Amino acid sequence: MAITLISHPNCYRHLAGDDHPEQPARLSAINDQLIRSGMEFIVQQRDATPASKEDIYRAHSNLYVDEIYAKAPASGYIWLDPDTQMMQHSLDAALHAAGAGINAVDLVLEQANQQAFCSVRPPGHHATRDQAMGFCIFNNIAIAALHAIEQHSLERVAIVDFDVHHGNGTEDIFAGDERILFCSSFQFPLYPNTGDVTQADNIENLPLPALCKPAVWREQILAHWLPRLQAFKPQLILVSAGFDGHREDDMAQFLLTEDDYQWIAQQLKQLADKHCQGRIVAMLEGGYALSALGRSVVAFLKGLM
């Protein structure tokens, strides 16, 4: 068993504004906690290579991708939506974030008992096929999934999203695609206020109320996600790993702790060991309380071991 952490310096260079919660300090907090916990000596670390435009086209419309490239500013900021900005380094950061997922898929499919965690930003799961949303420019997890299907000939890829916000972009891209099983747990109502109605048979949404306690969250996952995942028999498990459901994170009102993120990693590891030779790729989504984020990522990685 080996865990590889994939990142890139360019992911630190994307800036969304001084008072924006999606900051480079998020990646620093993860690195600091890896050092503090001694995990830096256990995980293998490597730099991501950027995704190509052709890679991005798999998940997004050509028109949208071309528009993002054309809009990328040489200086200053532009707004893609009320929450999502681009500056001169944002396109490179987004390409390296998406590229990390592609690199991770290639890595874990080369040999069994491999897991990878992509410590990248900007996040991706709110980006729809043709729209930037919620801090997200390109949908990193969708790009990784389609790379696995089209370049590695996989037929069944599971995407598990435990960010406290619904992965509306991933659902938009994959609703009705029987090659994908998408499972998303999230607080509802809460931005983006979607997911309460199931759009397709390959979607398993778990809308849960504010102040959701860990025991309830775990019970719902055991009752709804795991039976679907077992029946699907995935050849690869991808994880949109958002840690903003932590009780210390003020972006929402869940009551989870780092122990819950270790638990979900253990559940996914058992599933992966049974169906896909332990192959798991996780990509960072949300998580904005810096200390809680670092602790939660380390706990999640320990759960994969």
Predicted features and spans:
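HDAC/HDAC-like amidohydrolase catalytic core signature
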Residues: 1-160, 165-305
